[in-house]
């Protein structure tokens, strides 16, 4: 059983003692009896005496997503379904024709390197020796390339939504000097290269043009929205996370390349967050009942697995295990391992990428540096405003928002859940502000990068803490040490042209892009009408 504690989950909510969504069964006289024989249970029909053995009830991570009790604490109950023991068990019983992949996030690589005092290249070699040389995987890849594909999709989605929102305002004859008169703002999507003018052919993209767009790569945040703030679902980005994009790429390619069944390709993902297990279990991320990502492990679980297998990563750097990676099992157009120069936040750089892309595509600004003002509200909430190079008018406003304290404020800000009196006060302030500068909308965001963990993905719940018990290091200082490795200088090998080439090789028909790269969300209804269920808590 993987080691988890309440302290690992800053948003932990104690699960209820009973299911909060019980089946509604009308009381009626039973026509069957139940007979117990040893460890087996049988149902006996009273009229005919016919006997049938009852199966064992089970619950999966996917069932957990349909429950509206807790938010992200569910993995403390069900995480063993994707534990390292289950991974090892699968490897022991795997089919001979099976292809095994490992995908690795750059946050995990940086965390493991910092924990063991190794370089990124050294920890990468250790992981390859363990998974390929010892456990028999065919290939290990990082998610940098799939992340670049996702970022490009997110940026195009934002530009489409921004243009649709602007068109909607114009149809309603809403006067705005920046939108209607600004010479840099295009009057149609056809003026923008790389932005789709017809979103109906890109059904996965946020077609309703609801701003702000809220990033969706954090499954803890997605669970929170689906279970407690479903009114925000239209704002969520429809683009898959890098984990799920990578899983889809690998399985699609292997099935086609080797003419094999989808369930003969097995994919393990190494991620900084336990919630990624829940994401991998969503029905939306499976094809014909086969998941794109079969299992997810975090650095905390990897360390436990190393101990179980009696593997010392530091010793491996001195006495390496020979191994041979199967190059035939990797798409030739997908960069296997890239020590990229990481740009933007240590949570994937969504906001920074979208801001730069939108500045160029929407306003013709190549270098946003001189025209972006930053307002650091606190360590985990930072606002960015792009202004016109000549007039200093506000063009777009974005933010990074980490941790549930800031998320709750964001929710109130986006859909105004405050009291009427407070709303009136804010309205008066906004009216006065607009009277002084009619082009400013300080309370409006156009795009927000949202992560449930304080500090973002680099500080995910599955990341390893500072290793020494002899010296006390604050969580913030440790996170900065890991970030230093994450941002270690590298070479940008995945650019826009490389992303376009990968998409062409993977998705032959551009109209199918939404099927491969986009997803959907659903409101999870709560049952708060039963006072007995509400009172019966641990």
Curated annotation (Swiss-Prot):
What GO biological process, any one, is recorded here? iron-sulfur cluster assembly
**Where, in this chain's numbering, is [4Fe-4S] cluster 1 bound?**
19, 64, 67, 70
Protein keywords: 4Fe-4S, Cytoplasm, Iron, Iron-sulfur, Metal-binding, Nucleus
**What subcellular compartments does it reside in?**
Cytoplasm; Nucleus
KW Ion transport (keyword) present: no
**Gene Ontology MF terms in the entry:** 4 iron, 4 sulfur cluster binding; ferredoxin hydrogenase activity; iron-sulfur cluster binding; metal ion binding
Q: Which GO terms describe its cellular component?
A: cytosol; cytosolic [4Fe-4S] assembly targeting complex; nucleus
Which of this chain's residues are annotated to bind [4Fe-4S] cluster 2? 218, 273, 453, 457
Q: Per the record's keyword annotation, is Lipoprotein included, yes or no?
A: no
One Pfam family from the record: Fe_hyd_lg_C
Q: Which PANTHER family match?
A: NITRATE, FORMATE, IRON DEHYDROGENASE
Q: Record's family?
A: Belongs to the NARF family.
The record's function comment reads:
Component of the cytosolic Fe/S protein assembly machinery. Required for maturation of extramitochondrial Fe/S proteins. May play a role in the transfer of pre-assembled Fe/S clusters to target apoproteins.
The protein in question is named: Cytosolic Fe-S cluster assembly factor NAR1 homolog
Q: Which organism is it from?
A: Schizosaccharomyces pombe (strain 972 / ATCC 24843) (Fission yeast)
């Amino acid at each position: 059983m993987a080691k988890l504690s309440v302290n690992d989950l800053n948003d932990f909510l104690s699960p209820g003692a009973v299911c909060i969504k019980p089946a509604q069964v009308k009381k009626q006289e039973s026509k069957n009896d139940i007979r117990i024989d040893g460890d087996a249970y049988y149902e006996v029909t009273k009229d005919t005496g016919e006997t049938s053995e009852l199966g064992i009830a089970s619950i999966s991570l996917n069932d957990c997503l349909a429950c509206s009790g807790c938010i992200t604490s569910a993995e403390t109950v069900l995480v063993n379904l994707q534990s390292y023991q289950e991974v090892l068990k699968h490897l022991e019983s795997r089919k001979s024709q099976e292809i095994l992949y490992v995908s690795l996030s750059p946050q995990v690589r940086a965390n493991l390197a910092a924990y063991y005092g190794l370089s990124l290249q050294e920890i990468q070699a250790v992981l390859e020796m363990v998974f390929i040389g010892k456990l028999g995987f065919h290939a290990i890849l990082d998610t940098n390339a799939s992340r670049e594909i996702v970022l490009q999709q997110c940026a195009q989605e934002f530009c489409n939504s921004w243009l649709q929102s602007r068109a909607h305002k114009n149809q309603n004859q809403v006067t705005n000097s920046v939108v209607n008169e600004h010479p840099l703002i295009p009057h149609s999507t056809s003026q923008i290269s790389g932005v789709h003018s017809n979103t109906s052919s890109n059904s996965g993209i946020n077609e309703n043009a609801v701003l702000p767009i809220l990033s969706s790569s954090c499954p803890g945040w997605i669970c929170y929205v689906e279970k407690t703030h479903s009114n925000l679902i239209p704002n969520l980005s429809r683009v898959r996370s890098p984990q799920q994009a990578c899983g889809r790429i690998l399985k699609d390619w292997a099935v086609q390349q080797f003419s094999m069944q989808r369930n003969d390709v097995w994919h393990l993902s190494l991620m900084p967050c336990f919630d990624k297990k829940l994401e991998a279990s969503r029905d939306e991320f499976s094809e014909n009942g086969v998941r794109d990502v079969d299992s997810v492990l975090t650095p905390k679980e990897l360390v436990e697995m190393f101990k179980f297998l009696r593997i010392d990563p530091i010793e491996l750097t001195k006495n390496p295990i020979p191994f041979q990676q199967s190059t035939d099992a990797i798409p030739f157009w997908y960069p296997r391992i890239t020590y990229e120069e990481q740009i933007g936040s240590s949570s994937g750089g969504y906001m920074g990428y979208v801001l730069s892309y939108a500045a160029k595509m929407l306003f013709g600004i190549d270098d946003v540096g001189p025209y972006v003002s930053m307002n650091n509200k606190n360590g985990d909430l930072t606002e960015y405003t792009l202004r016109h190079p000549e007039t200093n008018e506000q063009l777009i406003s974005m933010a990074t928002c980490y941790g549930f304290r800031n998320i709750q404020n964001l929710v109130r800000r986006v859909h105004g859940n405050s009291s009427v009196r407070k709303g009136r006060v804010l309205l008066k302030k906004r009216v006065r502000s607009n009277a002084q500068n009619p082009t400013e909308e300080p309370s409006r965001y156009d795009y927000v990068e949202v992560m449930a963990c304080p500090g973002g993905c680099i500080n995910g719940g599955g990341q390893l803490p500072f290793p020494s018990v002899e010296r006390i290091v604050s969580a913030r200082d440790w996170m900065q040490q890991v970030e230093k490795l994450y941002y270690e200088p590298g070479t940008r090998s995945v650019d826009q042209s490389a992303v376009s080439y990968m998409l062409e090789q993977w998705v032959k028909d551009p109209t199918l892009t939404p099927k491969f790269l986009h997803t959907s969300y659903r409101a999870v209804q709560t049952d708060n009408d039963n006072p007995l269920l509400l009172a019966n808590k641990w």
